[in-house]
Amino acid sequence: MAQKPLRLLTCGDVEGKFDILFNRVQAIQKKSGNFDLLLCVGNFFGSTPDAEWEEYKTGTKKAPIQTYVLGANNQETVKYFQDADGCELAENITYLGRKGIFTGSSGLQIVYLSGTESLNEPVPGYSFSPKDVSSLRTMLCTTSQFKGVDILLTSPWPKYVGNFGNSSGEVDTKKCGSALVSSLATGLKPRYHFAALEKTYYERLPYRNHIVLQENAQHATRFIALANVGNPEKKKYLYAFSIVPMKLMDAAELVKQPPDVTENPYRKSGQEASTGKQILAPVEESACQFFFDLNEKQGRKRSSTGRDSKSSPHPKQPRKPPQPPGPCWFCLASPEVEKHLVVNIGTHCYLALAKGGLSDDHVLILPIGHYQSVVELSAEVVEEVEKYKATLRRFFKSRGKRCVVFERNYKSHHLQLQVIPVPVSCCATDDIKDAFITQAQEQQIELLEIPEHSDIKQIAQPGAAYFYVELDTGEKLFHRIKKNFPLQFGREVLASEAILNVPDKSDWRQCQISKEDEETLARCFRKDFEPYDFTLDD
């Protein structure tokens, strides 16, 4: 049975004209049926007053489709994007983040890069650097199984995209655009590449990603630049298309060449093209292995196994976790880690007080190396995670508390197992379970109970986004995230009147304390936890 295609819409610079955009989308859906996603490139916010945006932000108005947007391209609009890792801006409107890979439940793979090119250091909050592009390429391109991605979203055009192609109109692609984006497109081989900022519509003829007669056939790339919303010249700013994720396609069907396919615009013509020489100097590859945003993990698993087996003289030695090429707030060796919050360090994991915790003893179990989710952990790391969980249960039980453990593998870079103690006097375990199920139903979240002794790896494949909660009885609840998911869901349930009764603490950013107070809490926890510290037994 053929895979049903996804129906997507892509939009150029919105520039704050939200009503015009969403009214147009509604009209299209009324006429042609519903679409699965709306992807926005270019400037989502403009220099117009915020009154129109406030209606969406407060929920007075709602986007009629799940919408994903890129970040700021100038200093003026940085204020709208509070979290560099991505966040929900309004209902049905999500900021993807500075850079990363979004893999939907369908398997569709979208790579995104926010901002404009900058070669300055430090890089402004609205720009990307050669290192950003290098890390994106490193995520995927270093595996032999890599064939390309479904969609690439950037705001700037790629430089030289007009080479060998149809006319790009008034835009001179030899002078306009970003060479870094060209390099990224060369490496990632997207089936579709969308960009904006130039206030015009340009659909380039598809170009090939292989050298004829020298390389095996590969899929073609279609580059589409979109105009700004509501432009007086009526230039096209919305693009509708259907796509089957490449991982689900028959290989022969995927590499079929369109009749109007051209040479790759990022390679020189003639004899130099036949030798595979590129116009662009390659972006320097990071020495680090991989850095995963959102959901992409499959490449890492395959690559790490092969790489370690070749490089290690001792096969039984635990394999090293992938290292992020950029800053990570939770890799213990990273200078970004707030080390005053660390309360215990094991061989493969460590404990840290949660910043803006639900209680003074709300802690996180984190891998020392860079892993994004539990399903990615190696056996030795899983073993120590379980040891920490069991030890914390005993510790909190001695203090008249039961603990709830949850993980949200969505919009996160580094695995964080949240461990929240709940006083036995507050409620029973069944009350906690009922609270999760009730709030999930209210928010139309399908929370399923899974077997007590089941392994999360049996139900969540690498690359899948999910939410998972484990109760002190061993009962487990699981939700496979398909589209959007409330980032604070776990905290909201536990902060509710039915459990901890601290609803004002549902968002960690609203309950931060001073560094001095954090240091005091950390000292107290270390002292109290010391009798249970299994790391002292080694």
Curated annotation (Swiss-Prot):
It comes from the Eukaryota. Residues 259-278, 298-324 are annotated as: Disordered. GO terms for cellular component: post-mRNA release spliceosomal complex. GO terms for biological process: mRNA splicing, via spliceosome. GO terms for molecular function: RNA lariat debranching enzyme activator activity. Belongs to the CWF19 family. This is CWF19-like protein 1. It comes from Pongo abelii (Sumatran orangutan).
